[in-house]
Every structure is written in structure tokens, then in C-alpha cells.
From Swiss-Prot:
Molecular functions (GO terms): rRNA binding; structural constituent of ribosome
One GO process term, biological-process aspect: translation
Organism of this sequence: Ligilactobacillus salivarius (strain UCC118)
HAMAP family in UniProt: Ribosomal_uS14_1 (MF_00537)
Protein's UniProt name: Small ribosomal subunit protein uS14A
Classification of source organism: Bacteria, Bacillati, Bacillota, Bacilli, Lactobacillales
Gene: rpsN
Length: 89
């Protein structure tokens, strides 16, 4: 479980990225790099670190399921992820 402050910071960054996405897109098309530089640093999507949606863990993140390997394994064993089952061959 990540610290609550890290999870809050991540959510705040996500909101900033969403808020400035259209503005950033227009400034890039117009090659207005001076105005682009004046936007908040956290509005840049490159600065976002993918985190687990359940507990905020930043490592071992699986993009397709938006969760860490630990939560993925736990939920898969419980059968709560549709279409996922243990492999056998």
C-alpha cells in the first residue's frame, strides 16, 4: 500500500493532465513553446507514473488491467477478473 500522500499527488496530477490536455495540444501544433513552458510542470503527461488503481503501488504495474501484479494475482485467483483463469497445459 502506497502512502496516502503519494496517491493524492497522483490523482492531482491526473486532473492537471486532463485539464491542460487540449491547451497543450494546441500550443504544440502552433509551435508556441514559450507558452507551453509557462504551463504547470505536472500538466505534462510524461511526468505521470502509472500506479495501481486499488492500492497505489507504482511498481510491477500491468497496463491492461491497471493494477499491480500482486492485486492482479489475488483477484484472478478469486475469479473477479473476467476472462482470466489459471493456465494449464
Amino acid at each position: 500500500m502506497a502512502k496516502k500522500s503519494k496517491i493524492a499527488k497522483y490523482r492531482k496530477q491526473q486532473m492537471l493532465v486532463a485539464k491542460y490536455a487540449e491547451i497543450r495540444k494546441q500550443l504544440k501544433v502552433n509551435h508556441d513553446y514559450e507558452s507551453l513552458r509557462k504551463l504547470p510542470k505536472d500538466s505534462n503527461p510524461i511526468r505521470l507514473k502509472n500506479r495501481d488503481e486499488i492500492d497505489g503501488r507504482p511498481r510491477a504495474y500491468m497496463r491492461k488491467f491497471k493494477m499491480s501484479r500482486i492485486n492482479f494475482r489475488e483477484l484472478a485467483h478469486q475469479g473477479k477478473i473476467p476472462g482470466v483463469h489459471k493456465a494449464s497445459w
